From Swiss-Prot:
Involved in pre-mRNA splicing. InterPro entries: Bud13, CWC26_splicing_factor. One of its GO terms (cellular component) is cytoplasm. This is Pre-mRNA-splicing factor CWC26.
Amino acid sequence: MSLHDYLLKEYGPSDRKKKSKKVDSKSTAQKPNNEDVNSNANNPLRDNSEKSLWLSHGVNNIPGAPLSDNLTNKQKNGINIEPPSRTVLEPKTHNIETVFRNAQGHKIDVEAKTLDSDSGKRNSQEERIRILNMGEIQLAGLDGVSTISSKYTAEIRDNDPATEFDHNKGVNHQKISPLGRKLYAGTATENRFGILPGNKWDGVDRSNGYEKKWFKRQGELAESKIQEFTNSEDY
């Protein structure tokens, strides 16, 4: 006996029976009863009511619903089409600092303002403590500063240009040149040209003495003329 005949004898008949049983079970399961077909034909609404609507995971549509040509072609090709999902973007309010702005639109640094206010309070407190720890003489000196400053501000000075705007204040009249320049108000030695010194002259004569000698000689000549005239005889 060959090996082929042995295997066919031992294993062949049992496999054929199992295959035939499987085929018979499938055929019996696929054949519908005539009674069920007739009942479904008589009640057309029964089929629609008993169907459960469910979405296919791969295609994302309702089975049995009519599809357009484009969708059916794309599904046949293996392309899954999903509608665009609308996601609502919620504003991220966590860990966001509030921005403060002034009337011009510039950002206001709140921390810097608080630091400035704290430093100002600290400085004012230190100044108050310093004044409290002062002696009577130092406090009297502080009071005198304001009185002295008010005295100087109330005083009217001749060289103040702002006095020209207020005509009600009593200002000492000062000599003014034809060109509008202020002249020296005190006494000064004259010169042969008749030029007066400026208002800022300190009164010190810094010339070489020629003007003084010239005026002295002019006086001597005038006196000699007078003497000659008086000593002359009348005829």
